[in-house]
């Protein structure tokens, strides 16, 4: 990472809830090969034992499935899935879920069942774990009770997904609500425009983040303005939601001025939001799913050919665009692509479980955290991830649900 143009601001990690940026209109679906199988998944509430010594297999003896969205909303997850397949060959099998997962739940479930129909598939890494994932896990476990499930960026509330998946990985969304306002203030923001829609605002962790945004915007002298955008899974689709953003950002800047920071809870809205912010000279602090790759390349016409997961290259290109648009000090993100990290670490950790490198249980927290840190450093060598357990509203810590936080990278 070329430190001469990057300034790092440590993001304080919060042990609160989780709430993935749920690519509110998840990536689309395509059926994946039915070459997959399972190891066992525990019944709700009970711990699952990992592969025994007798069951421990070489890489050729098991497969790990990856389920992602399509590239229509964001291609990071599917790009990382393809990279894992390039790395491990036939050991990795991939599939996708439908763009309209809220109305095509049966397709989402059937794709997971097809993957699990291959007895060699012992674990499935799911990112983003959109609504319907918990039901799909239940269906798979009717015939594959020992299948290992690692769910990244869940679109279902913790009380729904936590009892189903063995491990849940998520950005610390409530924590982001704490750290975004002071970051935005340092970038010169006086107003924060928050784009969302009723479906997203029914999710516990998005609500928790929003509550923190209200509190910490007030503490930092920033006016929080809520704007309801079209739901990308609604009648107007992703195209309609994106068009709304392109038309509304200039209106908001005309009303509140250029010292306005923009945030949306939806992945599909990031590209038009970034483009409009750059074109109109506003402020951009963080995506819903923080990553240097999330929407920046398409929004700013950055050619990624041959550099699909090259963070150093991406940071250099982003700095060049910031310089070109005169946006110095007004744009930031994380140096680690969170959803790519969840796919990468999910596969690497599942492999360790299946090869008997954990403590004999599917959840070996020490090994999992070490794996996440190792994978993060593949993107940014000096990355330091903060990893905490999700704590529910009653103060109960959930051992299998991990909230992840990284540092801000501000382009000077």
Where in the sequence are the language-model features?
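Periplasmic-binding protein-like
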Residues: 64-68, 119-130, 147-152, 193-194, ...
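Hydrophobic alpha-helical segments within soluble ligand-binding/sensing domains
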Residues: 167-194, 244-247, 313-322, 337-354
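An alpha-beta-alpha
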Residues: 81, 173-226, 350, 373
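Hinge/cleft segment of the Venus flytrap/periplasmic-binding protein
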Residues: 314-412
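Extracytoplasmic "Venus flytrap"
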Residues: 57-84, 88, 93-111, 125-131, ...
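Flexible loop/hinge segments that line or gate small-molecule binding clefts
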Residues: 140-173
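Bacterial lipoprotein signal-peptidase II cleavage site
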Residues: 20-31, 35
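Extracellular/periplasmic periplasmic-binding protein-like sensory domains
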Residues: 217-224, 271-355
């Amino acid at each position: 990472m070329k430190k001469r143009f990057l300034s790092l601001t440590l993001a304080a990690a919060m042990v609160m809830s989780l709430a993935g940026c749920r690519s509110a209109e998840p990536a689309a679906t395509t059926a994946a090969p039915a070459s997959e199988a399972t190891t066992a998944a525990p019944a709700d509430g009970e711990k699952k034992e990992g592969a025994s010594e007798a069951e421990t297999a070489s890489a050729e003896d098991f497969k790990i499935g990856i389920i992602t969205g399509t590239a229509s909303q964001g291609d990071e997850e599917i790009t990382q899935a393809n990279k894992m397949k390039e790395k491990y060959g036939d050991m990795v099998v991939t599939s996708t879920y439908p763009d309209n997962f809220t109305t095509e739940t049966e397709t989402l479930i059937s794709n997971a069942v097809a993957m699990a129909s291959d007895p060699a598939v012992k674990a499935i890494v799911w990112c983003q774990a959109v609504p319907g994932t918990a039901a799909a896990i239940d269906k798979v476990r009717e015939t594959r009770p020992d299948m290992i499930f690692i769910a990244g960026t869940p679109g279902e509330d913790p009380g729904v997904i936590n009892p189903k998946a063995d491990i849940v990985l998520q950005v610390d969304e409530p924590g982001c609500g704490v750290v975004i306002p002071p970051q935005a203030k340092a970038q010169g923001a006086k107003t924060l425009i928050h784009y969302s829609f009723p479906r997203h605002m029914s999710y516990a962790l998005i609500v928790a983040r929003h509550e923190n945004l209200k509190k910490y915007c007030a503490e930092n002298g920033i006016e929080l303005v809520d704007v309801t955008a079209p739901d990308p899974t609604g009648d107007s689709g992703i195209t309609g939601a994106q068009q709304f953003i392109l038309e509304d950002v200039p209106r908001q800047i005309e009303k509140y001025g250029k010292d306005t920071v923009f945030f949306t809870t939806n992945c599909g809205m990031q590209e038009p939001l970034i483009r409009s912010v750059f074109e109109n000279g506003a402020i951009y602090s963080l995506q819903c799913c923080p990553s240097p790759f999330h929407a920046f390349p398409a929004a700013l016409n950055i050619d990624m050919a041959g550099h699909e997961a090259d963070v150093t290259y991406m940071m250099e290109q982003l700095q060049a665009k910031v310089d070109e648009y005169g946006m110095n000090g007004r744009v930031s993100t994380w140096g680690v692509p969170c959803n790519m990290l969840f796919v990468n670490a999910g596969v690497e950790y599942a492999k360790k479980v299946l090869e008997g490198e954990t403590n004999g249980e599917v959840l070996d927290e020490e090994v999992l955290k070490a794996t996440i840190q190792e994978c993060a450093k593949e993107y940014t060598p000096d990355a330091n991830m903060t990893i905490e357990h999700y704590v529910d509203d009653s103060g109960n810590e959930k051992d299998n649900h991990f909230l992840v936080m990284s540092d801000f990278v501000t382009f000077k």
